[in-house]
Amino acid sequence: MVDMKIWIDDVRPAPEGYVWCTTVNQAKSVIEDEDAIYVSGIELIDIDHDAGSYAEFGGDYIKLLDWLEETGRNYPIRIHSMNPVGVENMRRIIQKNGWTEIR
């Protein structure tokens, strides 16, 4: 069994070794199913802010952080967004919850 890394982005393809999610709803499903598949846990969530045309399927990616907070989940997070305001908003959620941000 291995730890899973999740890449959440609508445009940039996932690096090798990552599960690529393009929507918030897809990422939620992957996270909820992690116990049922081949992984022992989630090593990292590498996340963009802007979901582009995929926003209709769960909102911009910051909504995933809101959901993680609501459900009490805690995983290391890396933000790879080019949106400086979005990055700061995501960092506030990460810091408020005491989550680990990988830079």
Can you annotate each of these PLM segments?
Residues 1-103:
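Catalytic phosphate/metal-binding cores of nucleic-acid and nucleotide-processing enzymes, i.e., regions
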